């Protein structure tokens, strides 16, 4: 959503906290906001509601909102978050082992993915589609809400966990193609936990 830089954000109702889907009980939402998966990563910004009005999200730390979560305004009213339909791939496998293999290849490329019992859902990328089809997957283009699995480090806070490792391996596949992986990650090896 594009806003005029001269917008007076103080006139917008402020959302100051979040309730996870199902935590609101029977309290009805006074409004809804339909957001794509990348728009659901919020800390401080204006969000347009389905009725055209706006609220200022002003949270103490970044959060990744899920479909059905609620933004809680200062006056106690709730805004329900709806995951917007997005252009995604519906990826199917021959069996559970094949689905696990496909998930590994997707994860190895650090792609956001929705993981379900019988399919994987990712944002469209023609290069990844070709790779998956080359691995025997059935890939369909669909439009639906994208609800990726939240990673181990997506909780909105940092414990300072650290490790160092590198991947520098070459291997070949039974189908005659070979390629290498070479990338590294390094982090400070100190764990910092300040708990009072």
Swiss-Prot record:
One of its GO terms (cellular component) is cytoplasm. InterPro entries: UreE, UreE_C_dom, UreE_N, UreE_N_sf. The keyword Cytoplasm applies. SUPFAM superfamilies: Urease metallochaperone UreE, C-terminal domain (SSF69737), Urease metallochaperone UreE, N-terminal domain (SSF69287). Coiled coil: none annotated. GO terms for molecular function: nickel cation binding; unfolded protein binding. Residues 150-196 are annotated as: Disordered. This is Urease accessory protein UreE. The keyword Cytoplasm applies. One of its GO terms (biological process) is protein-containing complex assembly. The lineage of its organism: Bacteria, Pseudomonadati, Pseudomonadota, Alphaproteobacteria, Hyphomicrobiales. Its main location: cytoplasm. Involved in urease metallocenter assembly. Binds nickel. Probably functions as a nickel donor during metallocenter assembly. Keywords: Chaperone, Cytoplasm, Nickel, Nickel insertion. It holds the Pfam family UreE_C. CDD domains: UreE. It is found in: Cytoplasm. Belongs to the UreE family.
